Structure formats: structure tokens, C-alpha cells
Amino acid sequence: FKIISFLSTIFLGFFIISTTIYSIYMGFGPMSRKLKDPFEEHEN
């Protein structure tokens, strides 16, 4: 049981870190130029 819990902890940590890196990449990476900024569009 110790090996299974050890591997699941590593897998969960890797999953959280990869999701965070992916969200930062989607927010600030090359795809961010296609995203529209709602504050820039709303000018009076």
C-alpha cells in the first residue's frame, strides 16, 4: 500500500503542476494574442 500511495501522490502533484503550467501557457503564450480583452473593447 505504501508504493501505491507514493505513486498516486507523485501523479497528483505532476497533474496539478502540469495543469498550472498549461493554464499559464494558454494565458500568456502565443495563443493569448487571439484572446480579446473585454476592458480594451469597452471604451466610452
Curated annotation (Swiss-Prot):
Location in or out of the cell: Plastid, Chloroplast thylakoid membrane
Keywords of this entry: Chloroplast, Membrane, Plastid, Thylakoid, Transmembrane, Transmembrane helix
Membrane topology listed for this record: Single-pass membrane protein
Entry annotated with the keyword Glycosyltransferase: no
One GO cellular component term: chloroplast thylakoid membrane
Keyword ATP-binding part of the UniProt annotation: no
Record field: transmembrane: 3-23
One protein family per Pfam: PsbN
Family membership noted in the UniProt record: Belongs to the PsbN family.
HAMAP family assigned: PSII_PsbN (MF_00293)
Protein name: Putative protein PsbN
Organism per entry: Euglena gracilis
